[in-house]
């Protein structure tokens, strides 16, 4: 089958974001073409999945296939941040007793979703790269950065090529950019990507065989382990996989990485092993009798965002729009959240439920808020990593970080985007984001000052090191209260509970889209909470 000359929705990129969007839309009867530059199976890092992945897969009836494939079951994750007891996020809190997600081999899991999109009716082509787009003028005053939108014109066609020398043009009504970090629209046409200066890291990783199982006989047996480096420069992941290997990677601040490399005079595998010594539990316990079975891989791990994730007839999803440090394994969660958002916002316009401006604004807001939730958490935990012995997210009395992680658990398991629309729970969440800290006798002025420092620290990371004890106290409570949620139903109905500009998502098979809501589920703090998230995101 050759790439058609025209389609209703063109999706660029066959990763989890693009393939999931193609699946959702194809199941709605939409004419979809999905183009992936590489040939499957292709390698990708990012093996640890959040609990929320089950909800997304369940929505498109793909959950059972993931189970049948035999991926390593993930019942939670363990975080060793300081010498205090490690914290464990138990997926039973969101998936029920015995509930699990997976650690996946991405070359396999990504291909499963890509092929499934084809089974659902999407026309899928791998080894087919989109080289450029053609735009037509789209005169509309509403599409501007003041509402986090962009207007380079309306994209109407794409030029593609294959390694066999063939090429062509495909016209479309809509385009969804899931091209990953290459970010076709964001980097080539909008030029609106900005990097978080406080989260410029480098990752080195490889795969081992013969590793010891973590914490045998305990509740968190064989869970992924994330251990802070002893020098405070970063962290190490250890993720067991179903092919009898374990993925082990070092994530370190770029400046610390190159300084240590220069001082040691080492490179490649020797330098990687030297850095691992700063994570003694992983190095001395899990890897004691293990051997490396792959080459050492390296990649920049810079967190970034964009000033807009949508415009006239286009949507950005997954890493094509934004990327946040992978400490909480948020990549595939954010990919599928944004893919679903793009799908419902496009269908809403196609079905006459709203105009294009409203649909685009709904999507860009949804993406920005999801990204910012993880950004705020990562920045705070990063400070705890750097300030090893100071209590940032725990108290002097606590022996570990279980209380802090219990409060942020709905976010780091992805449940904040997949829970039920219980009014009381949502109101409490909104009030928390509004930083209602009266019980700590913290004035609005002090709150604003700390938020300002957090914002500026993204351009001046050293500001995180200069917070006063009082500011540290305020920041810790902001984070804890921001993400204090309750356990609730196990489905995607929270996605429908969010109201943006008066519209909420409808996730009904055969009729997905947006609908006008007469009554908000949240009280007046919701808009202020959203404003805070947006304000932090703007400078990310």
Swiss-Prot record:
**GO MF term list:** flavin-dependent halogenase activity; monooxygenase activity
Per the record, the GO terms for biological process are: secondary metabolite biosynthetic process
* Binding sites annotated in the UniProt record for FAD: 14, 17, 47
Residue sites binding chloride per the record: 330-331
Q: What's its EC?
A: 1.14.14.-
The record's SUPFAM superfamilies line, in alphabetical order, gives: FAD/NAD(P)-binding domain
Q: Which residues are glycosylated?
A: 159, 192, 204, 243, 480, 491, 523
The record's keywords, sorted A to Z, are:
FAD, Flavoprotein, Glycoprotein, Monooxygenase, Oxidoreductase, Signal
Question: Pfam families attached here?
Answer: Trp_halogenase (PF04820)
Observed phenotype of the null mutant: Abolishes completely the production of chloroisosulochrin and pestheic acid, whereas their non-chlorinated precursors, isosulochrin and RES-1214-1, still accumulate.
Q: Which residues cross the membrane?
A: none
Pathway given in the UniProt record? Secondary metabolite biosynthesis
- What up-regulates or down-regulates this gene? The cluster is expressed in rice fermentation medium. Expression is correlated with the production of pestheic acid. Three regulators are located in the cluster (ptaR1, ptaR2 and ptaR3), suggesting that the production of pestheic acid is controlled by a complex regulatory mechanism.
Per its UniProt record, what InterPro entries does this chain match?
FAD/NAD-bd_sf (IPR036188), Flavin-dep_Halogenase_NPB (IPR050816), Flavin_halogenase (IPR006905)
Its signal peptide is: 1-21
PANTHER family in UniProt: FAD-BINDING DOMAIN-CONTAINING PROTEIN (PTHR43747:SF5), FAD-BINDING PROTEIN (PTHR43747)
What does the protein in this record do?
Flavin-dependent halogenase; part of the gene cluster that mediates the biosynthesis of pestheic acid, a diphenyl ether which is a biosynthetic precursor of the unique chloropupukeananes. The biosynthesis initiates from condensation of acetate and malonate units catalyzed by the non-reducing PKS ptaA. As the ptaA protein is TE/CLC domain-deficient, hydrolysis and Claisen cyclization of the polyketide could be catalyzed by ptaB containing a beta-lactamase domain.
The family assignment reads: Belongs to the flavin-dependent halogenase family.
Q: What is this protein called?
A: Flavin-dependent halogenase ptaM
């Amino acid at each position: 089958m050759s790439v058609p000359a025209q389609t209703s929705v063109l999706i660029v990129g066959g990763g989890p974001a693009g393939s999931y969007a193609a699946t959702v839309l194809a199941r709605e009867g939409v004419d979809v073409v999905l183009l992936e530059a590489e040939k499957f199976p292709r390698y990708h890092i990012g093996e640890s999945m959040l609990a929320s992945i089950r909800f997304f897969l369940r929505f498109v009836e793909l959950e059972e296939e993931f189970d049948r494939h035999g991926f390593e079951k993930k019942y939670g994750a363990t975080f060793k941040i300081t010498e205090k007891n490690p914290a464990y996020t138990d997926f039973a809190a969101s998936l029920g007793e015995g509930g699990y997600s997976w650690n996946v081999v991405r070359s396999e899991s990504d291909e499963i979703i890509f092929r499934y999109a084809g089974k659902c009716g999407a026309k899928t082509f791998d080894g087919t790269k989109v080289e450029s787009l053609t735009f037509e003028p789209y005169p509309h005053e509403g599409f501007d950065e003041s509402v986090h939108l962009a207007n380079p014109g309306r994209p109407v066609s794409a030029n593609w090529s294959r390694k066999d020398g063939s090429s062509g043009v495909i016209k479309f009504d809509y385009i969804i950019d899931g091209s990953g970090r290459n970010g076709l629209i964001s980097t080539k046409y909008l030029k609106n990507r900005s990097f978080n200066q406080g989260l410029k890291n480098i990752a080195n990783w490889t795969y081992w065989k013969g590793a010891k199982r973590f914490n045998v006989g305990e509740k968190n047996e064989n869970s992924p382990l994330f251990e802070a480096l002893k020098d405070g420069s970063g962290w190490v992941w250890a993720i067991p996989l179903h092919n009898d290997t374990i993925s082990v990677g070092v994530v370190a601040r770029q400046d610390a990485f190159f300084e240590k490399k220069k001082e040691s005079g080492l490179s490649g595998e020797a330098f990687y092993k030297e850095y691992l010594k700063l994570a003694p539990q992983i190095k001395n316990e899990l890897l004691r009798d293990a051997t490396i079975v792959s080459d050492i891989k390296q990649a920049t791990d810079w967190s970034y965002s964009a000033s807009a994730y949508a415009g006239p007839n286009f949507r950005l999803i997954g890493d094509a729009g934004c990327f946040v440090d992978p400490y909480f394994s948020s990549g595939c969660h954010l990919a599928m959240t944004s893919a679903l958002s793009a799908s419902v916002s496009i269908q809403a316009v196609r079905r006459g439920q709203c105009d294009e401006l409203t649909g685009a604004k709904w999507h860009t807001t949804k993406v920005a808020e999801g990204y910012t939730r993880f950004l705020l958490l990562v920045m705070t935990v990063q400070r705890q990593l750097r300030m090893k012995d100071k209590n940032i997210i725990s108290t002097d009395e606590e022996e570990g970080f279980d209380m802090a992680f219990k409060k942020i658990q709905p976010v780091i398991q992805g449940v904040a985007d997949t829970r039920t629309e219980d009014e009381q729970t949502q109101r409490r969440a909104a009030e928390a984001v509004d930083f209602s800290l009266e019980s700590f006798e913290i004035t609005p002025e002090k709150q604003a000052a700390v938020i300002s420092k957090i914002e500026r620290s993204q351009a001046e990371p050293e500001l995180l090191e200069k917070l006063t004890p009082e500011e540290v106290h305020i920041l810790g409570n902001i984070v804890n209260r921001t993400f204090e949620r309750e356990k609730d139903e196990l489905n995607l109905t929270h996605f429908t509970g969010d109201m943006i500009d008066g519209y909420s998502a409808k996730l009904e098979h055969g009729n997905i889209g947006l609908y006008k809501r007469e009554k908000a589920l949240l009280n007046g703090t919701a808009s202020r909470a959203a404003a805070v998230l947006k304000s932090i995101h703007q400078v990310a």
